[in-house]
């Protein structure tokens, strides 16, 4: 039977059902669009010789050099399951362009850890500052780097160029591992174990509590430890200067006998050992010993106030492979 309702509103029920379905579908679509609209990667063209500054209070930072002319940054939460907004801002300092990479302000809750993974051109300078807790890893750069984390480990490898590149590290509480550095190294730490190997320039490292171990260094070496040990292994150079000191702990230097040197060994409370017993060796007293080997050109100073001091002989082929 035809009624007024059926004549004026044919197919009314299917239309209502369709509208209801659309009503449920639209919010879901909008929600999905909002979720994937988060900036998960930033990219910016960078001039050669620019400086990249990284800020990330809580979380790890990983930086790798590439042959591209862009800086690219991705930020994720600790387990890597959720993208976090990241920004790259541009400024200048004198004639140098400065690009600052950081998670977007307000993109994290208090003390939430956010990890940054950044790719930069090889020929840039790098500076990581404002990192309170997190590890830093940097590799494959030709420019210098300046790194600091208040609590975390720092690892740097394959950094520098024939023109040189200073690697400067401050690590109040965390280990430091540097290798294949084509330039000078400066390290200041409070509680840290420091390992440095295969460096083309000078090495100067200081730690309050921990140990320092360096090997295969082409430049001068100065290691200073308040409480802990200091070790050097590798060839020395005729014009080289090597100074290892600790207040409380062991000092040891292991070198081939292929280069002449003059060594001053001292320990106020500890034993002195040497494999180099040349006719020119002198024993001033029980706490000091001077040794001249060969032409005496290199200069070695090993000192421990409370600990043993050793100067050991190794074969020339000993040591790590320092090819990059």
Located regions from the model:
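Intrinsically disordered, low-complexity terminal regions
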Residues: 1-324
């Amino acid at each position: 039977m035809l009624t007024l309702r059926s004549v004026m509103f044919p197919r009314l029920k299917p239309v209502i059902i369709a509208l209801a379905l659309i009503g449920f579908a639209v919010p879901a679509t909008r929600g999905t669009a909002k979720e994937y609209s988060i900036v998960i990667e930033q990219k910016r063209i960078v001039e050669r010789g620019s400086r990249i500054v990284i800020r990330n209070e809580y979380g790890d930072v990983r930086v790798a050099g590439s042959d591209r002319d862009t800086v690219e940054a991705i930020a994720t939460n600790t387990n890597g399951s959720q993208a976090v907004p990241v920004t790259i801002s541009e400024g200048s300092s004198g004639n140098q362009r400065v690009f600052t990479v950081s998670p977007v302000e307000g993109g994290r809750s208090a003390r939430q850890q956010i990890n940054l993974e950044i790719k930069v051109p090889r020929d840039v300078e790098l500076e990581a500052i404002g990192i309170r807790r997190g590890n830093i890893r940097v590799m494959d750069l030709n420019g210098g780097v300046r790194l600091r984390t208040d609590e975390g480990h720092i690892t740097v490898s394959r950094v520098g160029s024939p023109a040189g590149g200073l690697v400067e590290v401050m690590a109040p509480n965390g280990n430091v591992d540097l290798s294949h550095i084509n330039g000078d190294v400066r390290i200041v730490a409070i509680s840290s174990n420091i390992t440095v190997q295969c460096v083309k320039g000078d090495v100067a490292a200081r730690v309050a509590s921990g140990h320092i171990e360096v090997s295969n260094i082409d430049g001068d070496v100065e290691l200073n430890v308040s409480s802990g040990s200091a070790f050097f292994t590798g060839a020395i150079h005729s014009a080289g200067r090597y100074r290892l000191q600790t207040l409380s702990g062991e000092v040891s230097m292991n070198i081939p006998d292929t280069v002449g040197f003059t060594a001053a060994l001292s320990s106020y409370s500890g034993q002195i050992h040497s494999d180099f017993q040349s006719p020119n060796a002198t024993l001033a007293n029980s706490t000091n010993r001077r040794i001249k080997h060969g032409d005496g050109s290199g200069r070695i100073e090993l000192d421990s106030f409370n600990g043993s001091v050793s100067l050991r002989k190794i074969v020339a082929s000993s040591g790590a492979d320092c090819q990059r």
